[in-house]
Amino acid sequence: MALRIVAILLTLLVPLKATLSAQDFANVAIKAVHVAGNVYMLTGSGGNIGVSAGPDGVLIVDNQFAPLAPRIEAALKELNPGPLKFVLNTHYHGDHTGGNAYFGRQGHIIAHTNVRKRLGGKPGETKVGLPVITFDDSLSLHFNGEEIKLVHVPPAHTDNDSVVHFTGANVIHFGDTFFSGRFPNIDLGGGGSIHGYIKNIADAIERIPPGAKLIPGHGPLSTVKELREFHEMLVETSRVVEKAIAAGKSLKETQEAGLPDRWKSWAAPTITTARWIELLYRGLSAK
């Protein structure tokens, strides 16, 4: 009898979970911010979307969650009624590729080779949601009057990270290799690396053209100033955890000791201070 009651409760919870999930997105508004030239940034729920909207049509960088796709499409039409031609993925996570199946019916999906491999391994991922054009190192598109460069970077957030440079507008979309003003996630199971994060950001700071505007994977539109702060946080917090590991401290002890006060405001509901310390601890212990 008890087992039967449990089974009934589980049956009732499935649609409830789906309803709650739908409600999570019910009040999400997609907002557009003009960045420079033909480039815009869309915010909503999930990773920031980069947009090139001009005479050749529309190109998007990332596309958030599947339930938001119609609203994202409506926001794109307000910027430019022209057709969607290209869909770029900075990496494989669902808050950046959730709309692939929807937008993949309209434009060609382009991403690093490992994005297709990892998305292809996901149960239920339809073929239309997979990248149809892949690259290993870099790729250029000539679209809306400028060269748009996709460059794969060494493992940082994942093993399939790319940054997108709108060369004419002088705008760079970093995907999740840059979280502005907050702790990032490191997908250790997906090939991510704290050492790669630090090196990639240090290299980017040296190469960024003067006056460039930066679209982070998460957080507000930024400049190299915020990128430098992000790099400083990565270096300082990783050193704190590295010293704790060298001293034989456990993860719990390291979390209880915490981080310098200056980084308290970088915690977010998704990546709390304790979670960030855990990611650092696991990543640095594995070297």
Q: Where do the PLM segments sit?
A:
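Active-site metal-binding motif and surrounding structural segment of the metallo-beta-lactamase
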Residues: A32, P55-L59, P67-I110
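Extracytoplasmic/secreted envelope proteins and their assembly/folding machinery
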Residues: A36, I49, A69-E73, N100, ...
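Metallo-beta-lactamase
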Residues: G57-L59, F65-P67, S140, E147, ...
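Accessory terminal helices/loops
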Residues: L13-Q23, E206-R207, G211, P220-K287
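Divalent metal-coordination and catalytic microenvironments
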Residues: N38, S52, D62, L76, ...
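Bacterial N-terminal signal peptides that target proteins for export
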Residues: M1-L9, V14-T19
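Conserved beta-strand hairpin/beta-sheet module of binuclear metal-dependent hydrolase folds
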Residues: I30-A75, S162-F166, N170-F174
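Divalent-metal coordination cores built from histidine and acidic residues
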Residues: G94-P154, N160-S162, E206-K213, L251
